[in-house]
């Protein structure tokens, strides 16, 4: 699947990227190259191959899950600009 100029323009718009006309051909080529690599990887037969979570068979030593600090929620919320029902109120950032 090859991307066309209109596809790249739409992707740039959705990603809120400001691409100028000079950048679009280079970006189209780069994205098509990435998609070509994805196509190559999808074509590989992985039947019988167990998924790999980590290349090393090492495990981490885990500490006991215990509270190590006191709850300072009230202290932090006292200096917050806006709090309601124990939650921080922030400006809306998504339209």
Curated annotation (Swiss-Prot):
InterPro entries: Asp/Glu-ADT_sf_sub_c, GatC. SUPFAM superfamilies: Glu-tRNAGln amidotransferase C subunit. It catalyses: L-glutamyl-tRNA(Gln) + L-glutamine + ATP + H2O = L-glutaminyl-tRNA(Gln) + L-glutamate + ADP + phosphate + H(+); L-aspartyl-tRNA(Asn) + L-glutamine + ATP + H2O = L-asparaginyl-tRNA(Asn) + L-glutamate + ADP + phosphate + 2 H(+). It holds the Pfam family GatC. It comes from the Bacteria. One of its GO terms (biological process) is glutaminyl-tRNAGln biosynthesis via transamidation. It is an enzyme of class 6 (ligase). Keywords: ATP-binding, Ligase, Nucleotide-binding, Protein biosynthesis. Its EC number is 6.3.5.-. One of its GO terms (molecular function) is asparaginyl-tRNA synthase (glutamine-hydrolyzing) activity. Allows the formation of correctly charged Asn-tRNA(Asn) or Gln-tRNA(Gln) through the transamidation of misacylated Asp-tRNA(Asn) or Glu-tRNA(Gln) in organisms which lack either or both of asparaginyl-tRNA or glutaminyl-tRNA synthetases. The reaction takes place in the presence of glutamine and ATP through an activated phospho-Asp-tRNA(Asn) or phospho-Glu-tRNA(Gln). Heterotrimer of A, B and C subunits. Belongs to the GatC family. This is Aspartyl/glutamyl-tRNA(Asn/Gln) amidotransferase subunit C. It comes from Pseudomonas syringae pv. tomato (strain ATCC BAA-871 / DC3000).
């Amino acid at each position: 699947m090859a991307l066309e100029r209109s596809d790249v323009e739409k992707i740039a718009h959705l990603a809120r990227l400001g691409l100028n006309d000079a950048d679009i051909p280079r970006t189209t080529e780069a994205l098509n190259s990435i998609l070509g690599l994805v196509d190559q990887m999808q074509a590989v037969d992985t039947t019988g191959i167990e998924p790999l979570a980590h290349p090393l068979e090492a495990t981490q030593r885990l500490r006991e899950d215990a509270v190590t600090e006191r709850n300072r929620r009230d202290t932090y919320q006292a200096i917050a600009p806006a709090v309601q029902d124990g939650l921080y109120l922030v400006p809306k950032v998504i339209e």
